[in-house]
Amino acid sequence: LFDVLTELRSRGVLWAINTGRELLHIEEGLREFNFPIDPDFVLTAEREVFHRGPGGQWQDFGDWNQRCYKAHDELYLRSGSLLHDILAFLDRDTKAHPIFEGDRIIGLAAENDAEMDRICEFLERERVRVPGFQYMRNTVYARFCHEDFSKGTALSELGRLTGISPEHIFAAGDHYNDLPMLDGRHARWVACPGNSVEAVKEMVTRTGGHVASHECSEGVVEALRHFGALSQGEIAA
């Protein structure tokens, strides 16, 4: 994958990491895996958008992040009763652990996938009580969020800021929190590696994308080759 990214970069292609991880963990990961080239952008916490500033540090790209923080503060002000009931459910009916940021519950960690499935069923039923309340699942973790801010909408905002339309954006993902960016609205070219969860494979198939036979990064390279990006330069970002 590194060789492919280097080749695409030489042809003017921009690339971004779109992840549920926080910005600090992105920097740690880039150092740990010794990436030969830095991403042009990082989209973090499933909703934030950053680019390199003049001094080389990651900084907010536009006002998206500030709008995101404001929307989440307002959401939490309206969600007290719902969050109280979520905590009660976790304590009463599960072995899951709530995750706090200060005194605010921002998500949870379940014991296993089966328990997480059951918790998600509960969240789906209850979240309708608060307009805009959503959650993002990744393995046995869930993060509470505003439905207007996801990997998908963050990717669309990046496209708007860079002047790149969805017709020229490729996106690949493998887990539940990738679903919002793989529905065909934010990227015309979508794919997933062979080790993706079934929900992602189904989404990619419905949107006319490519479900790779190879796993992990090899699956991403397979998808880029499938779409002709490695030989014809059809994908601009």
Predicted segments — roles?
Residues 14-16, 107, 170, 191:
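A structural signal for isolated positions on well-ordered beta-strands in alpha/beta enzyme cores
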Residues 12, 39, 130-132, 187, ...:
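A generic structural signal for alpha->beta connector loops
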Residues 83-170, 176-184:
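Conserved acidic, metal-coordinating active-site core of Asp-based
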Residues 145, 152-237:
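Mg2+-dependent phosphoryl-transfer enzymes with acidic/Ser/Thr/Gly-rich catalytic loops
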Residues 26, 115-117, 198-201:
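Short, charged/polar "capping" segments at the starts of alpha-helices
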Residues 43-46, 53, 139, 194, ...:
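Residues at the C-termini of beta-strands that transition into short coil/loop
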Residues 1-91:
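Active-site phosphate-binding/coordination module
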